[in-house]
């Protein structure tokens, strides 16, 4: 069941490379769309590019609008590369805008003990 999407709960999928995190996230996004939710999946790198270029790129603005309308956003590969301060601030602002209205799935390449 996808009750958690309607309640704007978040999900962290953490583990080593090749453990199926992206597969699970994509499956949940697919099931959410089938259930009538607006859902979108994006890599962290593509999300940051979109946030940085939405004012100068028509494609980025279209993607940004789709992301902002999503009831579920899956962000893949969140720990694949180090983030700059500017990137962290953009993500913090986005997460704040989503609070209590959009569910997030984040995949991360580390174990919970790290």
Predicted regions and their residues:
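Pre-Walker A adenine-sensing motif
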Residues: 1-4
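Walker A/P-loop nucleotide-binding motif
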Residues: 8-24
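Residue-level preference for the first positions of well-ordered beta-strands
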Residues: 10-12, 72, 103
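Aromatic/hydrophobic pocket-lining residues that form π-stacking "cages" and hydrophobic walls in ligand
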Residues: 25-28, 94
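Post-Walker A helix-loop "phosphate-sensing" segment adjacent to the P-loop in P-loop NTPases
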Residues: 29-42
């Amino acid at each position: 069941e996808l009750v958690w999407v309607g309640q704007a709960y978040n999900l962290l999928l953490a583990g080593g490379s090749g453990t199926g995190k992206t597969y699970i996230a994509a499956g949940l996004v697919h099931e959410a769309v089938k259930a009538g939710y607006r859902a979108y999946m994006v890599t962290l790198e593509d999300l940051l590019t979109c946030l940085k270029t939405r004012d100068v790129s028509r494609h980025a603005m279209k993607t940004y609008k789709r992301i902002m309308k999503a009831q579920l956003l899956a962000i893949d590969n969140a720990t694949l590369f180090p983030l700059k301060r500017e990137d962290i601030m953009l993500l913090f602002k986005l997460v704040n805008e989503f609070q209590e209205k959009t569910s997030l799935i984040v995949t991360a390449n580390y174990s919970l003990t790290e």
